[in-house]
Amino acid sequence: MAAWRPPRVEELLAEARRAFMEEFGAEPELAVSAPGRVNLIGEHTDYNQGLVLPMALELVTVMVGSPRTDGLVSLLTTSKDADEPQRLQFPLPSAQWSLEPGIPQWANYVKGVIQHYPASPLVGFSAVVVSSVPLGGGLSSSASLEVATYTFIQQLCPDSGAIAARAQVCQRAEHSFAGVPCGIMDQLIALLGQKGYALLIDCRSLETSLVPLSDPKLAVLITNSNVRHSLGSSEYPVRRRQCEEVAQALGKESLREVRMEELEAGRELMSKEGFRRARHVVSEIRRTAQAAAAMSRGDYKAFGRLMVESHYSLRDDYEVSCPELDQLVEAALSVPGVYGSRMTGGGFGGCTVTLLEASVAPLVIDHIQEQYSGTATFYLSQAADGAQVLSL
């Protein structure tokens, strides 16, 4: 089986323009895109003020549209996986009236960004959303839509905020309109991604540094398990709370401030489960710093070893893996030429990410498909650019 080739931005843009013309009877005036992402290492560390190392993908959300004069927002998505209805209309928020989350869920990400957008006056608009980022696959379709929405509104009502402030608006939208207490990684990489680079993000200071990832002999393979265990949505807030409780027990603001020796010394202050959760986070922050350094010096073997350690820690200490993800990782690791593999994203399903020699990619894909009990989807990606304004 070959890796899936996602549609290029130009193809998505053409689809969006056609849909806009059909729905609204005119050509759109504006177009933007924002990418999904894969996190190479640094899982469940962002909401602990830790380090993460994502890269933007060539999978993107495209938004096209035009301003309106009646104070309404009219939306349509072409995504088959989005919940119904695929179109809706609502008035802009005002001093007297705030937007509220509702049905369909996909539109809540758009509503949240509109509600929290920092500049004024807001202008109504009609827009069509088209995306190649799979929903629920752990590749951040939500942040992709939030950042596309923010970038679109910027064209109608320019803001003066720094990029970190824009990411925080999108993060707040997800907290308050989707009910997900996410960290800030997904929004930052969607804004700041650069072709040929991963991005090391310090989620405490919001400082970022580019890590070269453009060796043509190297490939990043994303494997979607195509399973989504319902545990994911309920367990995410539990993990976050457990981390906060351990930090509090140790008198720290977050687990970022905790060294492994301090955690070991304070074992009696927390539950066995809390200790394991914190051990994952503290060790994962250290692994992420080491991995960024390894990638910068071209030491792919060291990077791969750290990926594998990360997976085992997520499986055993953080307990967010599942049999399907474990199967995919073990299958990948059994092929020569694979440097490392791990689950990526929140867990309980979704995707794995594998670093490998580009030449063995077809072999790895065939082997995983043979070994995997389910039906996986494969996607080979280069590190891509962040949000863009597209010309029409």
From Swiss-Prot:
Site (Transition state stabilizer): 37
SUPFAM superfamilies listed in its UniProt record: GHMP Kinase, C-terminal domain, Ribosomal protein S5 domain 2-like
Pathway: Carbohydrate metabolism; galactose metabolism
UniProt-listed Gene3D superfamilies: 3.30.230.10, GHMP kinase, C-terminal domain
Pfam family of the protein (one): GHMP_kinases_N
Amino-acid positions noted as binding alpha-D-galactose in the UniProt annotation, renumbered to this chain: 37, 43-44, 46, 186, 236
Residues where ATP binds: 136, 138, 140-141
A GO term for molecular function: galactokinase activity
Keyword terms: ATP-binding, Carbohydrate metabolism, Galactose metabolism, Kinase, Nucleotide-binding, Phosphoprotein, Transferase
Keyword presence, Protein biosynthesis: no
Catalytic site positions: 186
Residue numbers bearing the Phosphoserine modification: 230
Gene Ontology, cellular component aspect: cytoplasm
Family to which this protein belongs: Belongs to the GHMP kinase family. GalK subfamily.
Name this protein carries in UniProt: Galactokinase
Organism: Mus musculus
